[in-house]
Swiss-Prot record:
PANTHER family per UniProt: PHOSPHOLIPASE A2 (PTHR11716:SF94), PHOSPHOLIPASE A2 FAMILY MEMBER (PTHR11716)
Disulphide-bonded residues: 38-98, 54-145, 56-72, 71-126, 78-119, 87-112, 105-117
Catalysis: reaction(s): a 1,2-diacyl-sn-glycero-3-phosphocholine + H2O = a 1-acyl-sn-glycero-3-phosphocholine + a fatty acid + H(+)
Major localization class: secreted
Enzyme Commission number(s): 3.1.1.4
Cellular location(s): Secreted
Listed name of the protein: Acidic phospholipase A2 S13-69J
Free-text remark on how the cofactor is bound: Binds 1 Ca(2+) ion.
Removed propeptide positions: 20-27
Length: 146
């Protein structure tokens, strides 16, 4: 093996060792799912919200089909506002607490983390208040969301 190859291999190993000491950061979407479970007291699994109506899940267009779908539209709009502020809402980790009255943001000083946490807490509480209509899960968005 050439000396240059050994240097490259050594550099890779050292950088991997350094990366191993950095604790993994939770993705915001995982935290959001915990907030949803906290707000609805575990009455409905988080995956029920991933393909609901026109706005719950990835993307969104058209007129929301009901109150729950409006919660998702509002959450999408909140994330869009966060992005305008230079935040990365799907990657922002924050500190929250699950209390008797549902989730709330806790001791957050950074503006982006606070903004995103507020988006997620409000959406989770909205989900818990809104009725869930099984007929609006996994709908044909090409027909119903124009």
């Amino acid at each position: 093996m050439y000396p240059a190859h050994l240097l490259v291999l050594l550099a890779v190993c050292v950088s991997l060792l350094g990366a191993a000491s950095i604790p993994p950061q939770p993705l915001n979407l995982v935290q959001f799912s915990y907030l949803i479970q906290c707000a609805n007291h575990g009455s409905r699994a988080t995956w029920h919200y991933t393909d609901y109506g026109c706005y719950c899940g990835s993307g969104g267009s058209g007129t929301p089909v009901d109150e729950l779908d409006r919660c998702c539209q509002t959450h999408d709009n909140c994330y869009a506002e966060a992005e305008k502020k230079g935040c990365y809402p799907k990657m922002s980790a924050y500190d929250y607490y699950c209390g008797e009255n549902g989730p709330y943001c806790r001791n957050i000083k950074k503006e982006c983390q606070r903004f995103v946490c507020d988006c997620d807490v409000e959406a989770a509480k909205c989900f818990a208040r809104a009725p869930y209509n099984d007929a609006n899960w996994n709908i044909d968005t090409k027909k119903r969301c124009q």
